[in-house]
Each structure stands twice: as C-alpha cells, then as structure tokens.
C-alpha cells in the first residue's frame, strides 16, 4: 500500500494570520509592506493587500455588454513574507511566550512587541 494518498488534504501550520502586517522578503514585490487579507492553509499561501497585483480580462457575459479588465491580489507563498513592526519599521521573525494569565501570545523577536 505504499504511495497511497490520504483522503484528507494536509493543512500546513501558518506563521501569519489574517490581519497581520507583513513585508515581502523575496520576489517581484520585495520590500512592499501590506496587511494579510486572507490565508490559504492548504497551499501555504497568503493574500496581501496591494501586493502581487494581477490583471484579468473578462469577456462580456451578455450581448451589448462590454468586456472588462479587473485587477486583483494573487496569493503568494507564506515563506516569502515576514512579520513587520510599524513602530520600529523592521521585519522580524516571531516567537511565542506565555503571559502571566497563562495565554500564549506571538512576539516579534527583534523588538519584543506583542502581536496578539
């Protein structure tokens, strides 16, 4: 039974969540800062506002209607983004800490800033 695929898709652990501020660290949009709009855990990708803009040419659906050119944000791989501190203006990896009340929070390693 070697090589049999599982029926359930694998979901990868994401280091970013919706609403996080991130900086693109590689690719065409390297250096851009934006907010994560959507996460796609099955493919380990994220959609970042105003990053990886694509154009789509849409054909007219009805007679007499004109075609359109739409722009949208395409997903990029989560390994190509890094958390960004707005206060310090620096990108950083994250770590996890327990607070006094027992909550596990995400912390930027370079600045010590608590994310959530």
From Swiss-Prot:
GO molecular function, one term: rRNA binding
HAMAP family to which the protein is assigned, alphabetical: Ribosomal_uL24_B
Function per UniProt: One of two assembly initiator proteins, it binds directly to the 5'-end of the 23S rRNA, where it nucleates assembly of the 50S subunit.
InterPro entries assigned: KOW, Rib_uL2_dom2, Ribosomal_uL24, Ribosomal_uL24_CS, Ribosomal_uL24_KOW, Translation_prot_SH3-like_sf
Swiss-Prot/TrEMBL keywords: Ribonucleoprotein, Ribosomal protein, RNA-binding, rRNA-binding
Descriptive protein name: Large ribosomal subunit protein uL24
GO cellular component, as recorded: ribonucleoprotein complex; ribosome
Family matches, as PANTHER family: MITOCHONDRIAL RIBOSOMAL PROTEIN L24 (PTHR12903)
Subunit architecture: Part of the 50S ribosomal subunit.
Classification via SUPFAM superfamilies: Translation proteins SH3-like domain
Taxonomic path: Bacteria, Bacillati, Cyanobacteriota, Cyanophyceae, Oscillatoriophycideae
GO BP, sorted A to Z: translation
UniProt record similarity statement: Belongs to the universal ribosomal protein uL24 family.
Ranges for region Disordered: 1-27
PROSITE patterns, sorted: RIBOSOMAL_L24 (PS01108)
Gene: rplX
Pfam family, one: ribosomal_L24
Organism: Picosynechococcus sp. (strain ATCC 27264 / PCC 7002 / PR-6)
């Amino acid at each position: 039974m070697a090589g049999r695929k599982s029926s359930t898709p694998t979901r990868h652990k994401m280091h970013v969540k919706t609403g996080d501020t991130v900086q693109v660290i590689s690719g065409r949009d390297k250096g851009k800062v934006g907010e994560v709009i959507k996460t796609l855990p099955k493919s380990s990708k994220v959609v970042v506002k105003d990053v990886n803009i694509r154009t789509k040419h849409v054909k007219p659906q009805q007679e007499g209607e004109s075609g359109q050119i739409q722009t949208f944000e395409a997903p990029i791989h989560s390994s190509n983004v890094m958390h960004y501190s707005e206060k310090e203006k620096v990108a950083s990896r994250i770590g996890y800490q327990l607070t006094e009340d027992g909550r596990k929070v995400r912390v930027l390693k370079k600045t010590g800033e608590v994310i959530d």
